[in-house]
Design a protein with these regions (language model features):
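Accessible peptide chain termini
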Residues: 1-2, 292
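Bacterial N-terminal signal peptides that target proteins for export
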Residues: 2-15
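C-terminal motif of bacterial Sec signal peptides marking the signal peptidase cleavage site
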Residues: 22-26
Length: 441
């Protein structure tokens, strides 16, 4: 039996019902105010002209599919990423690890114990980190069966035998492809003259519905994987997803030449970087010569004060970040880093807020405006969320498409403005209505 626990930003949604603590109240009564005045704010550093430009072209009200999904399919699997693309997420999110032979993986944990059968395949190495294995060795592991065991209601036979993805895989899935597999379901790969893994073969996904999401990438602390940011930049260049000259980035092809409902992959904001690491943020700023959307993540800021919070924001600004990623109060025991005074402080800088992790309608209502508007005046200033990480992209899309749109129909507009990037404020107003199961089927 695999452990279902993942820390902080990575807590699976199926634990939320037991640990989630949320009151049905307005921000006037909300403990998130924490006693601080929104005017009690230390000096905040100024954004550069380039940071402001990036913020202007980064879309607002975006749905970020956390690891594809943790709820409907095994996290960061091909099934999860294809589901997130087809359900209509604006971004599919992945974490980066690196193998012994330098392959960049889409995988959260440094340990393989939680989400693979490493204890069966490599019993003497089960406690080794991912970086101790070659990619060929990792391809022998099953990342799907544990999910079926832990989540019988979401279990599917097609999840059995799923393998660990690479960053290459995630980018290709975002472009409308799937991994090419043999009759036994094993991926078909290219090898060099010594038999070493070089790359994977892909084919057009017959279930591709035309959506072209962006990719939201998290790197770990530099001491875990030296040179990761440089390798990431090179990988994105190889695929045409990044270039110092934005005009030279690849045009992502559409299915049958017709754009889908999501087309973030064909914008300058096609890639967003994120990290909790101070050193990681510094390295991102160094390696990516052209500034791109970059998020500095925050969590578990116990006893935060305006001064200490401003210090983190200023570090982020000084090192190229264009957005802050605070956690909402979605798990008992982990204090939020998005109290109203904290959200107001971020707003004063002009940075975007991409918060994590939303898994219920009530959480969206609490942070996007409706529950912070006791006088029913409307206003985007009451919305502390430009982007929402979620394990339920289907629920998030429905919230924007129907709930916030419903408030707008009543004259209460809580949408953040997309006027500067030339997109509609409600990116999901016309997203087809499909259930998560329908997309999986």
């Amino acid at each position: 039996m695999k452990s279902n626990f993942t820390c902080i930003k990575k807590m699976p949604v199926y634990l939320l019902s037991a640990s989630f603590c949320l009151g049905m109240f307005s921000c006037q009564d909300d403990v998130r105010t924490d006693g601080y005045s929104t005017k009690d704010v230390p000096e905040l550093h100024a954004l550069s002209a380039e940071q402001k430009e990036v913020i202007d072209y980064t879309p607002k009200n975006i749905v970020i599919a956390h690891r594809g999904t943790e709820f409907w399919a095994p996290e960061e699997s091909e099934a999860a990423m294809r589901w997130a693309r087809n359900i209509g997420a604006d971004y599919i999110e992945c974490d980066l690890q690196k193998t012994k032979d330098g392959v960049i993986l889409a995988l959260h944990d440094e340990s393989l114990l939680r989400t693979t059968d490493v204890e069966v395949i490599y019993p003497s190495r089960q406690n080794d980190y991912v970086s101790a294995f070659t990619y060929d060795e990792l391809l022998k592991l099953d990342i799907g069966s544990w999910f079926n065991e832990a989540n019988p209601e979401q279990a599917r036979s097609s999840f059995v035998g799923l393998d660990i993805l690479t960053l290459d895989d995630v980018l290709m899935i975002a472009e409308g492809y799937r991994i090419k597999r043999d009759a036994n379901g094993k991926r078909i790969v290219n090898r060099d003259e010594n038999g070493k893994y070089v790359s994977t073969q892909y084919e057009p996904d017959p279930y591709d519905n035309g959506n072209r999401p962006g990719v939201y990438i998290e790197t770990k602390a530099p001491y875990l994987f030296a040179g990761m940011e440089k390798a990431l930049c090179a990988c994105l260049k190889k695929h045409g997803w990044y270039d110092e000259d934005a005009s030279k980035m690849k045009k992502i092809a559409y299915k049958n030449g017709v754009p889908g409902n999501v087309d973030i992959a064909n914008t300058k904001a096609r890639i967003i970087l994120q990290t909790f690491s101070l050193g990681g943020l510094i390295n991102m700023n160094k390696e990516f010569k052209r500034k791109i959307p970059t998020l500095f993540l925050m969590y578990d800021i116990t006893n935060s004060t305006p001064a200490s919070y401003a210090e983190k924001i200023n570090f982020a600004i000084d090192n190229g970040a264009t957005a802050i990623g605070p956690n909402i109060d979605y798990i008992k025991g982990y204090p939020t880093s998005l109290y109203p005074w904290q959200g107001d402080m971020i707003r004063r800088t002009g940075m975007d807020i991409h918060a994590w992790t939303f898994n219920t309608q009530e959480q969206f209502l609490k942070y996007t405006g409706p529950w912070c508007d006791p006088k029913k005046e409307g206003g985007a200033d009451k919305n502390y969320v430009d982007g929402a990480f979620t394990n339920h992209a289907d629920l998030a899309i429905n919230f924007y498409r129907e709930t916030l749109e419903g408030y707008l129909a009543k004259g209460l507009n809580y949408f953040r403005s997309n006027a500067k990037c030339g997109l509609p404020d409600n990116l999901h107003k016309n997203t087809p209505v499909k259930t998560a199961q329908q997309v999986l089927d």
